[in-house]
Amino acid sequence: MNTYLGDKVAIVTAKPQTTRNQISGILSEPSAQVIFVDTPGVHQLRGKMNRMLVQSAWQAMHGADLVLVVLDGDAYLRHPDILDRDLEPLLRAVAQETRPVAVALNKVDLFHDKSRILPLLQQLHEAWPNAEIFPVSALTGEGLPPLLNFIKARLPEAPAQFPEDQLSTVPLRFMAAEIIREKLFISLKQELPYYTAVGIEDWTEDAASGLTPIHAVIHAGRANHQGMALGPAGQQRNGIEHAAQIC
């Protein structure tokens, strides 16, 4: 979604379950307006929060005109049983879909031997015969134009819902908090990022400088997590602050 929009709307990290909320991205072109909804990943991990994340993903899917499943091609190559093991509910739901379905096998830029993609594509075709499969790279843009053409060709005809310069329905305050949370996920180790949340307490726009000073609070799930998030002499916190500022 970020690649299509040419801007950061949804945060991205290598850690699973980074996305906690439905994030909209609006792509406006002369011939079409596409509203993407990025959702939490569908998985079978236990726990109340994980169940809430998956429920949010299902709710977003029910309201869409088209279903786009994005798979990590690199992880899929290393664990070919991922469909049966982790994505069984999604496998069943998509197989029963009557709406258009596209499956994007992402990160194909990591496949130096492109012939290794073919068995994966065959497995996906067998699992989802009702879907169009697209090998893509969100990093390099490889394969993205055909996928977008597929999406636009199957959207219902309707007037544009948003101004052409609007990229999302997400408030800027929320987006700022998400960017800080992204840096937490990147900087903090192991499970610690999953026990943190970010709130924006002060937002002051300075028209003269063009800058917006932000006072953000990082909430830690446990008392000992606070020190770990700060780091020695606050070095960890300073690094996260700097990374968020230059984003």
Task: Cite the ranges covered by each PLM segment.
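Amphipathic helical hotspot of TIR/SEFIR-family domains
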Residues: H79-A95, I200-T204
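Canonical P-loop GTPase G-domain recognition
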Residues: A95, R99-A102, D109-F174
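Conserved nucleotide-binding/hydrolysis micro-motifs of P-loop NTPases
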Residues: P16-T18, P40-H43, G73-L77, V108-F111, ...
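P-loop NTP-binding site
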Residues: L172-C247
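Structural beta-sheet core signal
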Residues: V69, V103-L105
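Conserved, well-folded catalytic cores of nucleic-acid-processing
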Residues: T3, D7, I26-P30, A60-V67, ...
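Conserved ATPase-coupling elements of RecA-like P-loop NTPase cores
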Residues: L45-M49, L53, Y76-L87, H112-I117
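Conserved G1/Walker A P-loop phosphate-binding module
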Residues: M1-L71, T212-A220
